[in-house]
Amino acid sequence: ALPFLYDDLDGFENKIIYYESSRGCPYRCSYCLSSIDKKVRLRDMQIVKKELQFFLDHDVPQVKFIDRTFNCNHAHAMEIWRYIKEHDNGITNFHFEVSADLLRPEELELIGSMRPGLIQLEIGVQSTNEATITEIHRTMELPRLKEVVKEIQSHENIHEHLDLIAGLPYEDYATFAKSFDEIYALRPNQLQLGFLKVLKGSYMYEHAKEYDICYRSKPPYE
């Protein structure tokens, strides 16, 4: 079992707590190192609940889950979301990275019933250009994603944070501008623009010359 790193919260005042309930990702996004090992390893749920309760008992302002795709396992996501709803202290906020198009009706119903500010969702879109999405091996149903984003907004209780990546294959200024306009039109609480990082060991790194990508040879490899 992984050691719990937050037994002593001294020094973490006004800082975000980063937390993992799983490792790995079942998807194959070509820019991501998690795509190399397609296995997802879930931590023991009783340990996860015990550690989350520690954060709740200490009124931690924010816990940021860094699971690559938090909702890739439906039962795992539902159990954690039910727990934090049932044990809500009225203070702590939980941040999750999710694939919006994978969210099921029962998940949407559950999160839609939560206290405003209990959770926030980061939704990776990266691009709306179909050729780019195919080339980076990303699985995404854009029409469904848009539906889910709007449904979440209708409850007015969850901060939505949508992501785009600039510099992806088959993306030029015109297609990126279209991606930006499409996502901006969804009116998320926050739209984050990141730049492609070509990480050693990734599919993107192995094929960078084919894409004619220019990037830094030192961190952050942008």
PLM segments and residue spans:
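Radical SAM [4Fe-4S] cluster-binding motif and immediate context
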Residues: 2-154
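Conserved C-terminal portion of the radical SAM core fold
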Residues: 56-66, 91-97, 112-127, 139-221
